[in-house]
């Protein structure tokens, strides 16, 4: 079996190569250069150390090694999407778009098509049911990354391998240390890759500029201060508002009037909701329900967290609606609600959250 292993230089993808070799495979290692390019040139993830480590892994295990670039595709599919989403007052999820369109989309079209499987360091597993492949959760509930994979397709999941999905993070690090891999003690990556060391607000300002507006208390209508543009703020945000007498949380955004609405307190009721409307829904393997009336029991996530929330999903025309058993903090339009079966084992798919008041 011909396997392409996507290796970033981090501990997880490095251990993927070890696991594949232990299983008797001879993977070809690919390092994907991603980042962004505009008229002023590249703003890239710091890649030199990553490539050096990945090259060492390839030599250690005797694997073929290729460095490939998807800069332009990353700009078109991920960076532009992020900028446009923020401009529309939405909260983007670039990680989901990168997995769907870059790692398992453009890479597949250019190089992956020549391989039987693509292996990655995601904390996820696959489950075979009646000859069909389903995305399923990892052994490590804290590191589980199925929510970042909630937009992939049936054809993509059929081809994916997750060699560390059955391991705890501590086990992965132990393997890396035992094998003396240079990535054994590297910290996990944080934040949006294409920004590198660039501050997120500096990035937003570069492409959207500033537009001063009012910060208003939701309950009273009192003007509390000013902001530099609604696109610098997201629903549920607490830090960076510059207001005294806090804590303050961003509750709503009026993008037409450029107003940020906030509520005061450590746990304001206004930041919670129980209804999540999704604009369409993308199933990964297949629609397990078909046409149905009433509701289906599910678990779900609206952000990257170890916890699953229990609820029910309904179909209203083309709209899917999740009704949560418990109140959810910071339901942000633009983010994705990732849906699982009631036992939170199978990841069924996801839909983009729209304003729940509509």
Curated annotation (Swiss-Prot):
Q: Which GO biological-process labels does this protein carry?
A: tRNA modification
Give the span(s) annotated as Interaction with tRNA: 143-145
The domain of life for this entry's organism is Bacteria
Q: List the disulfide bonds.
A: 98-193
Q: Which residues does the entry assign to the active site, renumbered to this chain?
A: 98 (nucleophile), 193 (cysteine persulfide intermediate)
Molecular function via GO: ATP binding; tRNA binding; tRNA-uridine 2-sulfurtransferase activity
What SUPFAM superfamilies does this protein's entry cite?
Adenine nucleotide alpha hydrolases-like (SSF52402)
Catalyses: S-sulfanyl-L-cysteinyl-[protein] + uridine(34) in tRNA + AH2 + ATP = 2-thiouridine(34) in tRNA + L-cysteinyl-[protein] + A + AMP + diphosphate + H(+)
Q: Which UniProt keywords apply?
A: ATP-binding, Cytoplasm, Disulfide bond, Nucleotide-binding, RNA-binding, Transferase, tRNA processing, tRNA-binding
What does the record give as EC number? Answer: 2.8.1.13
The entry's cellular-component GO terms read: cytoplasm
Q: Where does this one sit in the cell? A: Cytoplasm
Q: Where is this region: Interaction with target base in tRNA?
A: 93-95
InterPro entries the UniProt entry points to: MnmA-like, MnmA-like_C, MnmA-like_central, MnmA-like_central_sf, Rossmann-like_a/b/a_fold, tRNA_2-thiouridylase_MnmA
* Residues bound to ATP: 6-13, 32, 121
Q: Where is this site: Interaction with tRNA?
A: 122, 335
Q: Which Pfam families match?
A: tRNA_Me_trans (PF03054), tRNA_Me_trans_C (PF20258), tRNA_Me_trans_M (PF20259)
Predominant location: cytoplasm
Transmembrane keyword on record: no
Q: What does this protein do?
A: Catalyzes the 2-thiolation of uridine at the wobble position (U34) of tRNA, leading to the formation of s(2)U34.
Task: Please name the HAMAP family in this protein's record.
Answer: tRNA_thiouridyl_MnmA
Q: Which family does it belong to?
A: Belongs to the MnmA/TRMU family.
Q: What is this protein called?
A: tRNA-specific 2-thiouridylase MnmA
Q: Which organism is it from?
A: Parabacteroides distasonis (strain ATCC 8503 / DSM 20701 / CIP 104284 / JCM 5825 / NCTC 11152)
Q: Which gene encodes it?
A: mnmA
């Amino acid at each position: 079996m011909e396997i392409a292993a996507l290796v970033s230089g981090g501990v997880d993808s490095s251990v993927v190569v070890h696991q594949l070799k232990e299983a008797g495979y001879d993977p070809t290692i690919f390092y994907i250069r991603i980042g962004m390019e505009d008229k002023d040139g590249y703003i890239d993830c710091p890649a030199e150390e990553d490539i050096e480590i990945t090259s060492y892994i390839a030599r250690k295990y005797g694997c073929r090694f290729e460095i490939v670039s998807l800069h332009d595709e990353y700009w078109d599919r991920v960076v532009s999407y992020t900028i446009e989403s923020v401009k529309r007052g939405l909260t983007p999820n670039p990680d989901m778009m990168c997995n769907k369109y870059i790692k398992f989309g453009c890479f597949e079209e250019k190089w992956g098509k020549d391989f039987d499987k693509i292996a990655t360091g995601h904390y996820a597993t696959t489950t075979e049911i009646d000859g069909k492949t389903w995305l399923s959760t990892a052994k490590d509930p804290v590191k589980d990354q199925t929510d970042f994979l909630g937009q992939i397709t049936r054809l993509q999941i059929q081809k994916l391998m997750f060699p560390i999905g059955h391991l705890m993070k501590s086990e992965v690090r132990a393997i890396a240390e035992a094998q003396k891999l240079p990535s054994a003690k590297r910290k996990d990556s944080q934040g949006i890759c294409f920004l590198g060391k660039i501050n997120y607000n500096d990035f937003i300002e570069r492409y959207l500029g500033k537009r001063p507006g009012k910060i208003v208390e939701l309950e009273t209508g009192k003007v509390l201060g000013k902001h530099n543009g609604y696109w610098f703020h997201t629903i549920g945000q607490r830090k960076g508002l510059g207001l005294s007498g806090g804590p303050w949380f961003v509750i709503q955004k009026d993008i037409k009037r450029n107003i940020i609405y906030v509520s005061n307190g450590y746990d304001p009721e206004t930041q919670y909701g129980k209804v999540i409307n999704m604009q369409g829904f993308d199933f990964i393997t297949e629609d397990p329900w078909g046409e149905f009336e009433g509701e289906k029991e599910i678990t779900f996530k609206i952000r990257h967290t170890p916890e699953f929330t229990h609820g029910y999903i309904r179909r209203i025309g083309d709209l899917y609606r999740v009704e949560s058993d418990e109140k959810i903090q910071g339901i942000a339009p633009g983010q994705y609600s990732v849906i699982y079966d009631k036992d939170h084992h199978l990841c069924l798919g996801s839909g983009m959250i729209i304003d729940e008041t509509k």
